[in-house]
């Protein structure tokens, strides 16, 4: 089946969640009934919003409702894995809705693939990024006291169909992370491409690079199956 790229640009979180849920349900149903379907890779940005995953702890949000309103942010409890994270303008969010069985991927391998795609995007800007043991996502200097996260990852999978995905800080206002314990960590920082490069990075350029790396990695999986 084919995989198509969809760009929603700036979209409210609630609308994006509803639309990806509908597409997710459609793919699950089509797969179960043996019907044709499309894999989709959605890219977008959101207005200021915090999302708390199934395993998240309420005390990792440091603001009350009135304080959230004051910074023009909202909070959603959602059905992905992971703890609390922030989405906002200048952050590239990617929601792949994929049939993992088509690529012979398990959930752990899939998360590893998402991390690898972001690591390669960072490398294309001269930034050395990697993984941190027992901590999903992409990190800089992960094994040092200066460890800082540049990309959060949280997914949901049912019948080997995925939704939710990754959030890569490009030109993100990092002050919004100070209102939470990002992903439940209290001793690690966050960063962005702009923070590391000391200049704005064109969002369309980053989208193109991420699309390229995801496509390359998924195609490699398909080629391995064919061999």
From Swiss-Prot:
Its main location: cytoplasm. Pfam families: LplA-B_cat. It catalyses: octanoyl-[ACP] + L-lysyl-[protein] = N(6)-octanoyl-L-lysyl-[protein] + holo-[ACP] + H(+). Its EC number is 2.3.1.181. It is found in: Cytoplasm. The active site is at 183 (acyl-thioester intermediate). Transmembrane segments: none annotated. GO terms for biological process: protein modification process. GO terms for molecular function: lipoyl(octanoyl) transferase activity. Residues 35-222 form the BPL/LPL catalytic domain. The record marks 149 as: Lowers pKa of active site Cys. The keyword Cytoplasm applies. GO terms for cellular component: cytoplasm. It is an enzyme of class 2 (transferase). Pathway: Protein modification; protein lipoylation via endogenous pathway; protein N(6)-(lipoyl)lysine from octanoyl-[acyl-carrier-protein]: step 1/2. Keywords: Acyltransferase, Cytoplasm, Transferase. In the reaction, the free carboxyl group of octanoic acid is attached via an amide linkage to the epsilon-amino group of a specific lysine residue of lipoyl domains of lipoate-dependent enzymes. This is Octanoyltransferase. It comes from Bacteroides thetaiotaomicron (strain ATCC 29148 / DSM 2079 / JCM 5827 / CCUG 10774 / NCTC 10582 / VPI-5482 / E50). The lineage of its organism: Bacteria, Pseudomonadati, Bacteroidota, Bacteroidia, Bacteroidales.
């Amino acid at each position: 089946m084919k995989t198509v790229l969809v760009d929603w640009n700036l979209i409210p979180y609630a609308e994006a969640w509803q639309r990806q849920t509908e597409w997710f349900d459609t793919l699950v149903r089509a797969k179960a009934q043996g019907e044709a379907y499309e894999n989709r890779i959605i890219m977008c940005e959101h207005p200021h919003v915090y999302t708390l995953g199934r395993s998240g702890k309420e005390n990792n949000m440091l603001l009350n409702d009135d304080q959230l309103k004051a910074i023009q942010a909202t909070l959603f409890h959602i059905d992905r894995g992971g703890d609390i994270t922030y989405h906002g303008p200048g952050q590239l969010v990617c929601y792949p809705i994929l049939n993992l069985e088509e690529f012979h991927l398990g959930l752990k391998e899939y998360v590893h693939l998402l991390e690898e795609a972001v690591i390669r995007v960072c490398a294309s800007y001269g930034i050395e990024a990697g993984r941190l043991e027992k901590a999903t996502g992409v990190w800089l200097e992960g094994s040092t006291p200066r460890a800082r996260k540049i990309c959060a990852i949280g997914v949901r999978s049912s019948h080997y169909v995925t939704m939710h995905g990754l959030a890569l800080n490009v030109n993100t206002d990092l002050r919004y992370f100070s209102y939470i314990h990002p992903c439940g960590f209290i001793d690690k920082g966050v960063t962005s491409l702009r923070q590391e490069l000391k200049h704005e990075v064109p969002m369309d350029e980053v989208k193109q690079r991420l699309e390229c790396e995801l496509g390359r990695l998924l195609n490699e999986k398909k080629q391995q199956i064919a061999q």
